[in-house]
């Protein structure tokens, strides 16, 4: 599968532990990408949104988001603290074919 420019930027952000600012569904988001890959042939990312806007209320401290990368615009990488939430109780269902996962070091060496 050929990777989009957005996918490559999210990949770089994971490898370099950079924050991302972007527009998703018309809302400004500030997030850290955690799991990157594909589901149903679509480029997807499980990310932790820690600031910015949302269609729903963003809880204090942030929230997990499943992003369809085709809907992401205006991606910028920046330095800053890495955020990934405190709870990892549920198995993620956002990405079926995992390319990178910050929690699985072997994927970071590909």
Where do the PLM segments sit?
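Short glycine- and basic-residue-enriched patches
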Residues: 1-110
